[in-house]
């Protein structure tokens, strides 16, 4: 028999949905990262469209109430014609370039830790509000059963969409996790610390005044790079989230010690900027203790954290050496 083409019939089983529902992430706090990065992308787009009259309108609001978590932004919103593609289909994202999110698989991450996900959105210029209900509890039951389903069959079984009138000048996206049973997600202090170390927010005024601004005066190039960073105003239960860096720390002798001046650097290849960053030490060049949440040098892309504080540990000859520094590396090469 000669070579012949045989037709195929590709399908995706139900366990693909399990991956999209956060099964690949061991840390439940990633839920905050996924939704905030989507909000930041939407806010960036809204800003580019001139929808904000004031900078403080570029805001993400996170609220914990009882066992519910809500993440709300005033970004561009999802257009009515794109709701099914963006909020029901899997991995349809068209994001490129300066978008923090990429593949369109993060929106169901919270379904691993709650009984129901609710997405509400309205796009600027459209008189509609769309609401998507995803029954996460039912989805988990189906995935745990021995019944065989294709992924799209399960999505149809657990998802509903409704539409109602909305004012055309409204633009927003809101995701609510109902009946959250993962206690770490409901822990306000843990959530605020995770957000401060992860999402693209600005530094506190005191840290900028005492550590960064004096160094910027001597390094105008890096001040320009800093001003070009993506930042969003993130509020948690009404309180603003800032990066956790401070101008003083408590050392191993339980004494308060000042952080020294910031030093800047950049990485280039054949004249092309790959990354830039800053670092600092204590005035006495002592180690930052484990109680200092911002110790070590961190990696960021589009001002969103990549990995955690241990990312660069293998570059030091001794593990302890990494604790002498604080700082950030901002990758800019795509």
Regions found by a protein language model. Give the residues of each.
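GHKL/Bergerat-fold ATPase module
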Residues: 287-334
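Glycine-rich, histidine-containing beta strand-loop boundary motifs that form or position
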Residues: 34-35, 64, 73-75, 109-114, ...
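Conserved, well-folded catalytic cores of nucleic-acid-processing
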Residues: 39-42, 89-94, 116, 120, ...
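Interdomain "switch/hinge" adjacent to the Bergerat
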Residues: 1-11, 46-100, 125-295, 304-305
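Conserved ATP-binding N-box helix of the HATPase_c
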Residues: 23-61, 106-112
């Amino acid at each position: 028999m000669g070579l012949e083409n045989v037709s195929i019939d590709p399908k995706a089983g139900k366990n693909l949905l399990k991956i999209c529902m956060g099964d690949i992430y061991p840390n439940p706090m990633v839920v905050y990262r996924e939704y905030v990065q989507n909000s930041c992308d939407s806010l960036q787009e809204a800003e580019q469209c001139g929808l904000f009259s004031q900078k403080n309108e570029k805001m993400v609001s996170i609220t914990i109430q009882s066992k519910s978590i809500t993440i709300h932004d005033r970004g561009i919103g999802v257009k009515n014609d794109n709701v099914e593609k963006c909020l029901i289909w899997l991995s349809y994202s068209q994001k490129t370039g300066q978008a923090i999110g990429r593949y369109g698989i993060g929106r169901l991450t919270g379904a691993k830790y709650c009984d129901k996900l609710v997405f509400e959105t309205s796009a600027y210029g459209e008189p509609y509000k769309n609401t998507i209900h995803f029954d996460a509890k039912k989805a988990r039951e189906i995935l745990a059963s021995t019944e065989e389903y294709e992924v799209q069959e399960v999505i149809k079984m657990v998802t509903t969409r409704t539409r109602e009138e909305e004012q055309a000048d409204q633009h927003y996206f809101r995701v609510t996790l109902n009946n959250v049973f993962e206690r770490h997600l409901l822990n306000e202090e843990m959530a605020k610390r995770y957000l401060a170390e992860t999402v693209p927010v600005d530094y506190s005024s005191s840290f900028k005044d005492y550590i960064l601004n004096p160094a910027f005066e001597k390094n105008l190039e890096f001040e320009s790079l800093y001003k070009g960073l993506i930042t969003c105003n993130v509020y948690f239960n009404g309180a603003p989230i800032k990066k956790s860096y401070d101008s003083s720390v408590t050392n191993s002798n339980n004494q308060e010690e000042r952080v020294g001046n910031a030093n800047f650097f950049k990485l280039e290849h054949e004249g092309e900027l790959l990354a830039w960053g800053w670092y600092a030490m204590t005035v006495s060049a002592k180690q930052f203790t484990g109680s200092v949440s911002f110790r070590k040098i961190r990696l960021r892309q589009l001002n969103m954290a990549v990995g955690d504080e241990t990312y660069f540990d293998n570059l030091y000859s001794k593990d302890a050496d990494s604790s002498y520094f604080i700082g950030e590396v901002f990758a800019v090469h795509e």
